[in-house]
Amino acid sequence: MSQILSASSRLKPVNLHGADSETCTMVFKNHWNQVQRILESHDPFKNTQAKYRSISADEVSAVQNYVEHMLMLLIEEEVTDAAMGPILEYVVSENIMEKLFLWSLRREFTDETKYEQLKMYELLVTQSHQPLLHHKPILKPLMMLLSACSGTSTAVVETKLAVLLNQLCSILAKDPSILELFFHTSEDQGAANFLIFSLLIPFIHREGTVGQQARDALLFIMSLSAENNVVAKHIVEGTFFCPVLATGLSGLYSSLPTKLDDKGEDWHCLLKEDCLQIPELIQFQNSLEFCNAVIQVAHPLIRAQLVDYIFNGFLLPVVAPALHKVTVEEVMTTTAYLDLFLRSVSEPTLLKIFLRFILIHQHEKVHILDTLVSRINTPFRLCVVSLALFRTLIGLHCEDVMLQLILRYLIPCNHVMVTQRSAVREQDCYSACAEKFLSLTPECCALTVSSTGYLERRQTMYSKFRQRTDSDDSKHLYEKDTLMDGDCAEPVDDNYLEYLWEAHENILNCLEDCKVWSAPYDGQNPDPEISLKALMEDNCRRGEFPTFRRATRHYMDSFSSETPSLGGKTLLDLEWDDSYDTGMSPDSGSCSPQPSIDAVLPPEPPHHIQEMKRNAIMFIKGSYIEESDFQDDVMVYRLCAVKDAKDADMQNITDKNDIETNDQFTKPQEGNQTQANYNKNANLNEDTVKTQVKQTLPKVKIQLSPAADDISNMNTLSPDSEEFIARYDDMLNGLKTSTLEDVISPIHSLASPMEEDEDEFDKYSLDLPQAESIPSPFGPRDATIFSNFLPRPQTAPFTGPFISVVLSKLENMLENSLHVNLLLIGIITQLATYPQPLIRSFLLNTNIVFQPSVRSLYQVLASVKQKIEQLAATQQNFPVLLVEAQRYLLCRMDMPNQSADTFTKDNIAANTERKPAAAAAEAPRGVVQKAKEHRANPLLPLSGESKHIQNAMLAAALFPEFLKELAALAQEHSVLHSFHH
Amino acid sequence: MNPFWNMSSAAVRKRSDNDEKIATGDQKISPPRSSSAKKQLPSIPKNAVPITKPISPSPSVQPTNGTHASYGPFYLEYSLLAEFTLVVKQKLPGVYVQPSYRSALMWFGVIFIRHGLYQDGVFKFTVYIPDNYPDGECPRLVFDVPVFHPLVDPVSGELDVKRAFTKWRRNHNHIWQVLMYARRIFYKIDTTSPLNPEAAVLYEKDVQLFKSKVVDSVKLCNSHLFDQPKIEDPYAIIFSPWNPVLHDDARERMLAQKKSEEQSKGLHVSGLSWVKPGSVLPFSKEENSLQT
């Protein structure tokens, strides 16, 4: 080692500028002669004694000294024209470098020797005044050295190797003409291979500077490959670059912690500072970012291969199972990781496979998207983490995301009254919708706190507007200026201008991003009729009916919200995975005119879902509950049978169905086990039973043959069969209320023994209002009346699981914790920013008339308003508590925005400067953490008796702000629409 | 008080006579659709409608609380902004408007007449919008120089807008229609119940004399083109003679901007979409970049 150190210290450039070229060459040749003498004395070909003589230390150091000096001379040699300098020419013609390499091989080829040699080449390559790598006598020994180093394991050598490789690659990047040489020097040893590249691959996932150097070096080559088909082809066909990169991700992922430390109550996504605390995560992120960078610069062939490997080698085998782990905790962690990855990836090609994975991949026959949506409805932290993931997804402004999440349910326009179709495109010329949103402000919330920062903020807003006016030609902006000159803003308007400003910016951003979308989504394009067909075919292929789910779910949603729930009851909303049990699983497609085998025999809910449910229940109750506690499902089957029998009578379909129902009654196994499975955990109430009843409905129609569970049956009834639809409608119409009551009333009597049966689970479910709220399980009958206007199959209008779960969650605003509400508000305002008339009209047009079974945002907000007013009427010192809550929120707002780095992408990061509702939605994190740190801070603590009241008060304080945001968005849409084409 | 509100009332001169007797061309401009379309919907079954949602929105919702009322200026402002965007969208040939700096209720405009009797006429005008828009009367349009025309008041220069919009109906009538009407009177001359009887009579009886009077009027208007604007306002429309130093450059920039916009189209891709046009399925777009 001392040798190495001395070597590097002595190799300081000597000032040779004084010496003339001729002298230098003389000195060089002289030195070489000295060296050569020593070399030859040990060369077995030239000296027969050589093999018996050992190399003395003196000889070694003599050679070393000469060589060092020679290298200095070579490095310092300068030439004016393109020709080689005399020293270089001598080096090349005498093949000096190769001879030196062989000499070092002849000695013991230790790590120290390797280090020396690597160092020597590094100096040559980086310091030399003339290009050296073009010359094979220099390149070849270098290659030999590199390949000799490939198996090495010493950290010192590895570091040096990485540095040299990095240097070589950067030279390559600057001078691609050398590439050819690099490629073919090794041809002598066999197949063409790209040695520097292969040597770099093992370092890809290395941590620390070595890994960084190697990755940088690889990026040089990647950008080279973009221009060079040969290199690209070689990398794709001749190296394991892509597989190593992708499977490396899997390896690194598996070392990530499966559970995260408790990060505080309102933690919902991984921020930069979270990542920094987990070294494994840093390493993973490095590799992911490297993949991103490779995809950014590499040749399309490499890009395609890498993306393919990441999909098939990382997402499918690793992330998918991780998303379906057994414990809520693990699933939550995976969701948070996935969210982080989505935010870290910026290359569209890479993002695309992540989105493809989330949007259309199925795990155990269930779409990952559906699973993720259903998790919003859990009472755990998993809910907020899932919401955060969706916030990220929606913030991408990606057409495919919006299509799967929302638009596919809106395109058929089933959600609007037929006469209102054209209203989808209508603009709200006179701010009528904004007015309606604002009119939902509960009177009890009208008073506002004046905060100290308020005046300043207003000032900055004003100046911002003014600046904008000067610089921007958009015609209308100065009018805002006018408005402000008027100083007409009363206290209540204080931040409304900010909301308008932000809405303006956000809509413009979104408009810009949506320019690449394939269609305007205005209710005409894509054509509702044609698209409906395409979507139905797709659904068929997917084996489910997401477009036409039952309306019942909406009623369930409204039930839970209509529950007067502020009476201090336990409010554990254990609506676990409703969507799985009712709305989302394929068997719920019973409203669909498309019969399928799935409608007959619901598939087993995926194993992990059942597992999770069980876990969830344990979690909630803090103790394990025997599964058998939920096994009493015979009753349900009896009900199904009764119902089936009734239906059978109605339809005059006799024997076969009897057999079928008997079958079902007596042999509740296999497929029926599923029903058992979801009933055992579901709240056993009318809804569930209705679900059952409803699910049995299609059987009457479909099970024309006992072999109904035969797949082939699927084809016997065409989805578009007019006759089938007609009969289906008839049947629906035939089921008047009386029939329903007949069906439902026995449920009560049957259900009562169940309640006595120590079904503890019931205690955790919500008390549902009994008589008044029993809706027709088939959706309002009138829907079928309207259906007569439709030239196509009428289906229960359904705006999709996502909308429905988000709105139902929103309706429970007063029971939600602050961060759930902030996320919900964030998501809804993000959605309301989209300029597509279908989305805009659904969320913001308060005048449009929807189908009765469709619940609109306005209706949900109206219900929240009502609840707030109820609260105000019953809650003592409501005004005091409200002011406190407002102060609390203002405090959060004034805190420095710690999570500006939450979003790594520009389009989202642009929105960091925000105000009350939105600001908190983005940056809820730091605030409560700070609140914990400074418990003494007199402003922060809320004095509500319970967490429950505190949440309600915070929601009440947020609500008016949310309304302002929506109103502002509605107003800006009316002005900005013309920019959208 | 807010000048936003005062401005218009100060600027608008009251007109005493309303020509309500005149039948209008209203119908052609905006075919009367039933304004109560929403009410004619099939009645929604009671059990399906949440209590909170009003079944039919009443046209003039009275603000129920104080909070609500203070947003009035915003609603008016945005209504006018929306109107303005509609005007921009219409791209009426030869018609240009610009809201004033001081009030969104006052718009400056100019009409270029490119053929017909009034060919080469450049008529500046001002539009005054009532402050209870859109529930008030129709906007007024006053030419800076009274044009010789049967429907233009020879003294005040005001155009008879009312005959086209007997009653201003929100959602059906828009300001761009007023502007379109103002343009049309120069191409299709109507002489019934004129504000300028002389012009009307001449047009009926002696077209030649009418024509020459029109030519004089156009000349007069054009001679006042470079006058200072009648109403002093930073956004008033001002004409000045062509100044190569100033205008050549500006003109070039305007043309260049248009070109560069066209060029940059398609190059700048910031959004995300893998949906094939015409498809409603995600990731339906073929990846053609791979086959390079």
Curated annotation (Swiss-Prot), chain B:
Domain of life assignment: Eukaryota
Gene3D superfamilies on file: Ubiquitin Conjugating Enzyme
Start and end residues of each stretch annotated as Disordered: 1-64, 273-292
GO CC annotations, alphabetized: FHF complex; plasma membrane
InterPro entries noted in UniProt: Ub_conjugating_enzyme (IPR050113), UBQ-conjugat_E2_core (IPR000608), UBQ-conjugating_enzyme/RWD (IPR016135)
Entry keywords, A to Z: Apoptosis, Cell membrane, Cytoplasm, Membrane, Protein transport, Transport
Pfam families listed in its UniProt record: UQ_con
Keyword Mitochondrion: no
Skewed-composition ranges (Basic and acidic residues): 14-23
Keyword Cell membrane among record annotations: yes
GO BP annotations, alphabetical order: apoptotic process; early endosome to late endosome transport; endosome organization; endosome to lysosome transport; lysosome organization; protein transport
Annotated membrane topology: Peripheral membrane protein
Localization, UniProt: Cytoplasm; Cell membrane
Domain called UBC core: residue spans: 75-223
Sequence similarity: Belongs to the ubiquitin-conjugating enzyme family. FTS subfamily.
Function: May function to promote vesicle trafficking and/or fusion. May also regulate apoptosis.
Protein name: AKT-interacting protein
